[in-house]
């Protein structure tokens, strides 16, 4: 993305991201046929998206430029960008998924080492998990970049993770500001992914960059897998198309 002759390396999206706990079989339950399943209950396997780009449509609509990318044979179906004269970009996207999933949505890439801070209107100041939604408050929050390790460092609130009820979020970087307005009800904004400690006793999550997620993972404890952490920790059964809308501004 270029802004006033400056380059903001926000790219490679939208791309579908979907993952489930690596010890699961296709029916969500523990995979007894896998001899190494027990070793995988702290890791997540990402679904490869076989989507193939088929067509690009470009048209003008009321002074706006509308660019639609169409895909087939995979999860991502369509990404429609509406660009207005001020440089605001509205993304309407559609993807499909049928099956059991612990993490699902769309993602973009941005180099983490360029991030300075974030400010957002939404639930905060803490990140959430599927089984730890409650306890946040809806307000304007702000924090500097940090990358704490549970049990080893005590920097709070954590910068990275999944954030709920986000109306808008501004991510300040060394290259400029990435601003997004979330118009997808019940979607979460993912800011990279939480990092586990040295021994990886809790989770090893797939890299998700800056993401808009319909499903976020639960968190386990050191003893029990997520299956044993209550009803809110169970994976989601998803079937059919999923749609969303997010507006980007780059400053």
What are these regions (language model features)?
Residues 1-251:
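Beta-strand/loop-rich accessory regions of lumenal/periplasmic or secreted enzymes
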């Amino acid at each position: 993305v270029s802004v006033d002759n400056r380059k903001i390396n926000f790219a490679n999206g939208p791309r579908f991201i979907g993952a489930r706990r690596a010890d699961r079989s296709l029916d969500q339950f523990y995979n007894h046929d896998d001899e190494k399943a027990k070793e995988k209950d702290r890791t997540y396997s990402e679904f490869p998206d076989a989507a193939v780009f088929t067509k690009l449509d470009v048209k003008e609509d009321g002074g706006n430029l509308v660019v639609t990318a169409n895909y087939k044979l995979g999860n991502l179906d369509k990404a429609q960008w509406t660009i207005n004269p001020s440089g605001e970009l509205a993304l309407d996207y559609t993807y499909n998924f049928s099956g059991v999933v612990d993490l699902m949505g769309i993602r973009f890439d941005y180099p983490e080492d360029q991030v300075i801070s974030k400010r957002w209107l939404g639930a905060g100041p803490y990140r959430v998990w599927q089984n730890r939604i409650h306890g946040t408050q809806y307000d304007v929050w702000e924090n500097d970049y940090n990358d704490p390790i549970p049990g080893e460092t005590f920097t709070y609130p954590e910068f990275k993770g999944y954030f709920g009820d986000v109306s808008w979020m501004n991510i300040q970087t060394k290259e400029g500001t990435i601003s997004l307005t979330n118009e997808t009800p019940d979607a979460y904004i993912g800011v990279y992914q939480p990092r586990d400690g040295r021994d990886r006793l809790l989770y090893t999550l797939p890299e998700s960059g800056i993401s808009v997620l319909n499903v976020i993972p639960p968190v386990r404890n050191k003893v029990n897998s997520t299956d044993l952490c209550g009803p809110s920790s169970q994976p989601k059964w998803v079937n059919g198309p999923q749609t969303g809308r997010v507006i980007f501004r780059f400053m």
